[in-house]
Amino acid sequence: MNMKKLVAAAALALMVVGTQAGAETLRVGSETVYPPFEFLDSNSGKYVGFDIDLIDEVAKRAGFEPQILSMGLDGLIPALMSGSIDVAVSALTITPERAAKVDFTKPYYESGLSIMARKDDASIKGVKDLENKVLCAEIGSSGSVFMSKIKGAKIRTFNSAGEAFLELNNKGREAIVNDKPVNEYFLTQKASANFNLREVPGVLKAENYGFAIRKGDDKLRARLDK
């Protein structure tokens, strides 16, 4: 390689490094045990899923380099409010309760809630059948909020939807209300063959997901909404 080509190659390399170094870090909080939206790929050791792909693309278009920080669902909003993260991306339903504490970007996914019950329990056919039942939920989820309004229901919360599914399968509880896409995805996986679970047909409540940001952070919201 002659000197001119060497200098040109070096200049190009510096431009690439400079571009990467110039990108702002976007601290992204996510509950990374919620497939298909966010989970750890056992082969690559990297976080993957619909939300991960989406925030990666959105962040880079906005001039950010996303940094995924794994945490529990119930810890996302406190982390936002304390400034530990910049944005929460975790199949977060836009609800009045959450909107009182944080702001949301434009909705990016239409979702909804559905019931999971055991195959050997045909008594649960709809939300009315959940009254006075012993139920389980993921802590901090919109499903847990929905169930808290069911007459006579007793609810035990778990750190993840997976733990709640296991409790339901082991007959520790009678049903769970959870995000419909997650319920459906779970039932398509090989691991579900070891579970005696079924999804009750129908959507209990339509929901929208959004990225959560700190109250008043209009600049960040505008960049992410572009």
What do these predicted regions represent?
Residues 24-91, 100:
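Extracytoplasmic small-molecule ligand-binding "clamshell" domains
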Residues 64, 92-94, 106-155:
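A conserved helix-loop-strand patch within extracytoplasmic ligand-binding domains
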Residues 32, 110-117, 180, 184, ...:
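Periplasmic-binding protein-like
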Residues 75-78, 90-100, 146-149, 174-205:
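A ligand-binding cleft/hinge motif common to bilobed small-molecule-binding domains
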Residues 52, 67-78, 122-123, 141, ...:
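Short helix-initiation/N-cap motifs at beta->coil->alpha
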Residues 52-61, 121, 128-129, 134, ...:
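Extended ligand-binding regions for polar small-molecule ligands
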Residues 60-61, 70, 74-87, 101-103, ...:
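Short helices/loops that flank or line small-molecule/ion binding pockets
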Residues 38-42, 55-63, 127, 140-161, ...:
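Ligand-binding cleft/hinge of the Venus flytrap
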